[in-house]
Amino acid sequence: MQAVKRGDVQASLEILPVRHEAYLVEALRLQANYAAQVQILIGFEAEFIRQDFTARVIALARAPCVDYFIGSVHHVHGIPIDYDASFYADALAASGGGEERLYEDYYDLQHDMLLALTPRVVGHFDLIRLLSADPARDVSRWHGVWERIRRNLQLIARQGGWLECNTAALRKGLDEPYPCRVIALEWISMGGKFTMSDDSHGVAQVATNYARGISYLESLGVDRVWTLERQPHQDDQSAALHDKSVPLIEFRKHFS
């Protein structure tokens, strides 16, 4: 992002494939080294800024070592909405100057992402609220926004996707994880499932605020989260994955 702010966009983009390949090599090494102790899944977070990102994501996901990817939206009208107040203001202006319209545009782009990528996990569903004027607002009172939220949740449910209970929101000062309570309750009413995420960008952030995240889910009436379990496979083939539920009462024992 710093490279983008300096205008050196091309240099920023050119290094990404190299970093991704290095990540896969290291992930495979760790997966093999620790196979007797822990099952390591290999995945990536797929950015969706516009439609022409689709082919790139699908190509990356085809690698046999990749188990899954997270589909996320961090930009609206090509402008970051979670980086700082200045970028958020630019995105707001690009949407016409009103937050309600910016939220609508965010969820429309998210809908495009869902249709194009069908991600197994949807990242930080309501990231748009992070830098908004009122992150705790009841978005169900914005008719157009709420229609789009429900539309997207229904699509994720039909696709068999999961939402993150993403505790990075707590680390960044919000009162609730992503998604917020009104959205989480709507998702639960559709039979939706949650997986746990710290959205860590470094070792120090691993499992940050998981105890609070578990309490949040329990307050919603959720009693389990979901993960994926790999099955034995040949090295040149993708692993078969099975859904596995983890009771919160057991999960909490690791974060008391």
Across the structure, where does each feature detected by a protein language model lie?
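A metal-dependent hydrolase metal-coordination microenvironment
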Residues: 1-86, 205
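Histidine/acidic residue-rich metal-binding segments in metalloenzymes
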Residues: 19-20, 24-32, 39-41, 56-65, ...
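Short, basic, glycine/proline-bearing loop/turn elements
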Residues: 38-45, 91-96, 137, 165-171
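Catalytic metal-binding/acid-base residues of hydrolase active sites
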Residues: 45-48, 74-76, 126-128, 168-170, ...
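Surface-exposed cleft-lining segments at the edges of enzyme active sites
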Residues: 85-103, 129-142
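Hydrophobic faces of well-ordered beta-strands that scaffold small-molecule active sites
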Residues: 40-44, 69-71, 121-123, 163-165, ...
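Charged catalytic cores and adjacent phosphate/nucleic-acid-binding surfaces used
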Residues: 130, 135-256
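Active-site-proximal loop/short-helix segments
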Residues: 1-3, 79, 83, 121-136
